[in-house]
């Protein structure tokens, strides 16, 4: 009788381990496209990611760089004042998207041009995405104002 209980306990533990491993594998598989790493323009220029890697880039839209092309295609440059990366986006830009304003884009770097699939802009004068603030602070160009929340 004791041998049967021990055998049953081992079977339950083994089954629980297999279920846990399967659940972990399914969660990892489901999240593989949902994790995008943030990079500043300086990081992109210094160590360009592969063309298949989806990542986020953030900084300020360089003054005088915004060019509206055919249809919904827009090109501009994003900078952290140390490096600049050209960006190409086809779609509708957020209403508050403007030159010399903060932005975060999601996409891939293809032939030195960031091909954005999504562009986000700061929603008012006091908000800037935390990743952009951190990158600009690291470059020494971020100026904190009284009414600006700290990330």
Curated annotation (Swiss-Prot):
Any single Pfam family the record assigns to this protein: CcmE
Keywords, comma-separated and alphabetical: Cell inner membrane, Cell membrane, Cytochrome c-type biogenesis, Heme, Iron, Membrane, Metal-binding, Signal-anchor, Transmembrane, Transmembrane helix
Statement: the UniProt record of this protein carries the keyword Metal-binding: yes
Lineage: superkingdom: Bacteria
Compartment(s): Cell inner membrane
Spans within the Periplasmic topological domain: 31-151
NCBIfam families named in the record: PRK13254.1-1, PRK13254.1-5
Function of the protein: Heme chaperone required for the biogenesis of c-type cytochromes. Transiently binds heme delivered by CcmC and transfers the heme to apo-cytochromes in a process facilitated by CcmF and CcmH.
UniProt-listed HAMAP family: CcmE
The protein's name in its UniProt record: Cytochrome c-type biogenesis protein CcmE
